[in-house]
A protein has these predicted regions:
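Short, ordered beta-strand-loop transition motifs
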Residues: 1, 56, 204-206
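Short beta-edge/loop segments at beta->alpha junctions of small alpha/beta modules
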Residues: 1-35, 148-175
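Residues in well-ordered beta-strands of folded domains
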Residues: 6, 62-64, 211-215
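Short, surface-exposed beta-strand/loop "edge" segments at domain boundaries and coil↔beta transitions
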Residues: 13-15, 32, 68-74, 220-221
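A short linear-motif detector with a strong N-terminal bias
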Residues: 15-17, 23, 39-42, 103-104, ...
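Intrinsically disordered, low-complexity boundary segments flanking structured domains
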Residues: 24, 46-51, 197-200
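Exposed, interaction-prone assembly regions rather than primary DNA-binding/catalytic cores
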Residues: 35-100
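Hydrophobic alpha-helical interaction segments
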Residues: 93-229
Length: 229
């Protein structure tokens, strides 16, 4: 059985003594060959698409696939959240190796390791799957605003392989809202959006085109509110 050893830390377990979660992930992926990846909001953050920090709590780190259970018990500077890869029919579609930014961490810089992480096209779908319990419409909307360079062919492939109708409908709710140039090149004919209305959030309003309940301010033509991060 694979495992890790860590030198006992100081009595108080200060933040400085905690393991950089990226080092733990790269060790599990590269040295121990565990088949999992970093995804969702975490992958979007690694790729520069998240510009806010969680206040008052450790940052959630989203892992997808067969991540080792001991990873969740390590005293890292993140809070691991384990997810399956069932959101897609093809489990490894839209996953690429990403060089870690050194930002002062000599180990990351010298070892030249990479992290297996979702591409932005996959990561935004994983992030949408966290609504409404583990993320907010405001945060997703802010992230979507910056997704100006998604690859339409990859978007099409991932949406066609996505197994959750509500995630696909939500994607188009935000995509239509922001009208990035790549959207007109997405082949909607191969994407199954299901049929019928979907009740997604309590007290929401039904989107007139995508037939899913969402906060009223995200309905086209409605005044915008701010539900906070």
């Amino acid at each position: 059985m694979h495992g890790v050893y860590r030198r006992p830390s100081g009595r108080n377990g200060s933040a400085e003594e905690r393991i950089d979660w990226r080092i733990a992930v790269m060790s599990a992926q590269t040295i121990m060959d565990y088949p999992f990846h970093v995804g969702g909001r975490t992958a979007l953050g690694l790729r520069g698409h998240v510009h806010y920090l969680a206040l008052g709590a450790a940052e959630k780190i989203f892992f997808y696939g067969d991540a080792p259970r001991w990873l969740a018990n390590l005293p890292t500077n993140g809070l691991p959240v384990l997810r399956s890869t069932r959101l897609f029919k093809t489990a490894d579609l839209g996953i690429e190796s990403l060089a870690a930014e050194p930002d002062g961490n000599a180990i990351l810089f010298l070892q030249n390791w990479t992290i297996r992480a979702s591409t932005p096209e996959r990561a935004i779908l994983e992030a949408l799957d966290e609504l409404p319990d583990n993320d907010s419409f405001h945060n997703i909307d802010t992230i979507f605003e910056g997704l100006t360079n998604l690859r339409p062919r990859r978007v099409t492939e991932l949406l066609a392989a996505c197994t959750k109708v509500q995630v696909k409908r939500l994607f188009f709710v935000f995509a239509d809202r922001h009208e990035h140039a790549w959207l007109k090149h997405v082949d909607r004919s191969v994407i199954d959006l299901g049929s019928g209305d979907r009740s997604f959030i309590k007290g929401g309003k039904l989107h007139p085109k995508y037939r899913i309940t969402i906060p009223e301010e995200y309905i086209p033509g409605k005044p915008e509110g701010n539900d906070g991060p």
